Amino acid sequence: LKILENSCRYENKTVTLRHGFFKQMVMKYLDPKADLTFKKIFGNHPKRLISLLNALLPLSEEEQIHEIKYLPTELVPQLEGGKNTIVDVLCTDVRGRKFCVEMQMEWSDAFQQRVLFNASKLYVSQAKKGGKYSELQPVYSLNLINDIFAHDTPDFIHNYRIVHDKDSNKVIEGLHFTFIELPKFTPHSIADKRMMVLWLRFLTEINSNTKDIPADLLNDPEIGKAVEDLEVSGFTDAELRAYDKFWDSVSVERTLLDDRYQKGMEEGMEKGMEKGMEKGMEKGMEKGRAEGKHEANTETAQRLLAMGLSAEQVSKATQLPLEIIKNLSNT
């Protein structure tokens, strides 16, 4: 197949083959996390979006969503000269509550601040001249992260509210934030939440290498329809090119972040050789986090082991369990 693709690169004749015949031979489904597919799946299917929101947001039985209306995804500032922002999916329900959904491939502190900014803007936008503050409705921000940012806990769902610092039962209602670290998701950890498990499996198990879909995903009406919308045959050549371009940009971004992170690690290691390995590791980690991905991962641990550090030092520096580090050192 690679030869077949390469043979058609001359005279700019690759497009039809690569994104038509060749693509369909290789792939059956697209990854739902890509910008194109995520918006196609959830941006124009109310019942499907309602199912996702009810499954993933911390809503009580009385707070469940029953009907929504889509809103423009561009958030225009209230004041002249303010900052315009765009979200992936935005809707409101019959109560007037706002629901903002974002699919993010890479974690950064800047993204967290953007989430706060967007939710605050949605909350403030409800205020009308002469209106009552008591009429303002809550804003829910659901953020699906294809990355790990909380290394100090196995929890992958993080819900935030404005609470009293000494009594969490005292809450200022209005802003609700949910962050889900998709790479941490394991179905058995939330087996009692069936729809949450199914939607997270849909987001994490289906990709360009998928050939067969598990029956329990297909048996759910909304998820089954979403799977159909991921079939390669339903996309145009232009859409497939946009899909490829998206993943290319993600790959470039990750490479740049990893390079910055590794550079910080190496600079810290050099200083550490002079002032003590422990202190140097700490500086390297701090600089690496400031310039790059802000986390220690398995690849970094392997590099440190190759440099001759002990399993205990690598475990301390990367925050990975000692058992995992020892397993890496034996491979």
Predicted features along the sequence, with ranges:
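Conserved single-residue anchors adjacent to enzymatic active/cofactor-binding motifs
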Residues: 3-9, 14-238
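Short, charged alpha-helical interaction segments and adjacent helix-coil junctions
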Residues: 20, 24-26, 99-104, 201-331
